[in-house]
Each structure stands twice: as C-alpha cells, then as structure tokens.
C-alpha cells in the first residue's frame, strides 16, 4: 500500500493448442498464447506467441518436419528477453546470439530413420535442416531482410521402447550469414528431437 492506495497486479496466461489433420500422413499443430501482467493501467512483461508445426510422413522411415514461430514482447522485465541461437532453433549460430523483443524463426528438416532398436539400446536416424530467424528490438520493425540462415545435418539417437527418456540429437550447423567475430560452424547436442 502506498499513500492509502493499493497497488494490484493481475497475472494472465491464456493459450490454445490445436491439431489439424491434413490427410493421411500429415498434420499441423498450431498454438497461440498470451502471458502478461496488468498493473497500473498497462500491460507489463507481456509476451504473445504464435507457433505452427507441420509433419509429413513420406514413408515408414522418412519424414518432413517444419515449424514457424513468432513472439513479441512488450514492456518486458529487465531479466526477460527473447533469445535466438543454437539453443532454441537457429542451429548455425552460437547460444544466445541474438536478443530483443520480437522473434521470428522458420525451420525445415528432412529426416531419415536408419535403424530401430540397435542392440535393443537405441534407434538411429539422420536429418538435413535449414533454419532462418532473427530477433528485433522493440524500436525496430520486423524486416525479413534481417533473417539469418543456417544449414546443417543432424544425427538422431532415439532411446529404446522400454526407456522413458526421449532421444538425443547431435547437430552440425553452418551459418550462411557472416557475423563479425563469430565462427560459422556450430556443433551442438541436446535432447530435443520432438517435431
């Protein structure tokens, strides 16, 4: 309480995820989300997110996966920022290479599954990918000419059917847009194989 008044804040988180079948062997999962805090008559730390993921299974052991993501932050708290790099989808650029209040990411990946239950321990696959994205500050307008693009390959290791753990991926990405003082090759490993 300050000067007899009460400062109140309302925290809001709302979203919807919808699967959309497009026919045999392919579908889209679309998501819209808003998170924010309303206080003193304005929205603070407000983040609007739109995502869509597409999967097309060409054959039993071959699939195409793509995604698009757009996020816009408004009056973000100092400790909150939108980051883009190898850790969240732009696989040819270092961790947290780009930051700002607006993020756009487009990815496409062709996957080939090579072997199932090798020694009853893991499954093996490979993928080729292209990622393109950027992050703009609140003062900048979204400009597709700013997009940074990377291409690369991935080794996909899936756990066996008895394990509750997900798979592991090892990515080798090459940034097509040269950045001052930054190498163009990025090697990364992680547990995000989901489509």
Residue ranges and their predicted role:
Residues 2-195:
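C-terminal transmembrane beta-barrel domains of outer membrane proteins
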């Amino acid at each position: 309480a300050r000067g007899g008044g009460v400062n109140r804040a309302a925290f809001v988180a709302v979203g919807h995820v919808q699967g959309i079948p497009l026919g045999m062997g392919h579908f889209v999962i679309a998501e819209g989300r808003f998170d924010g805090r309303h206080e003193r008559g304005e929205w603070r730390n407000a983040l609007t997110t739109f995502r869509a993921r597409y999967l097309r299974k060409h054959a039993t052991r071959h699939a195409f996966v793509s995604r698009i993501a757009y996020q816009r932050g408004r009056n973000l708290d100092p400790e909150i920022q939108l980051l883009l790099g190898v850790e969240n989808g732009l696989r040819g650029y270092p961790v947290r290479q780009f930051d700002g209040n607006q993020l756009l990411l487009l990815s496409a990946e062709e996957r080939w599954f090579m072997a199932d239950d090798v020694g009853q321990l893991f499954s093996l696959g490979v993928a080729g990918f292209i990622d393109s994205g950027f992050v703009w500050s609140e003062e900048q307008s979204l400009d597709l000419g700013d997009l940074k693009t990377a291409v690369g390959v991935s080794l996909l290791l899936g756990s066996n059917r008895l394990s509750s753990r997900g798979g592991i991926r090892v990515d080798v990405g090459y940034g097509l847009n040269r950045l001052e003082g930054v190498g163009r090759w990025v090697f990364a490993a992680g547990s995000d194989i989901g489509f």
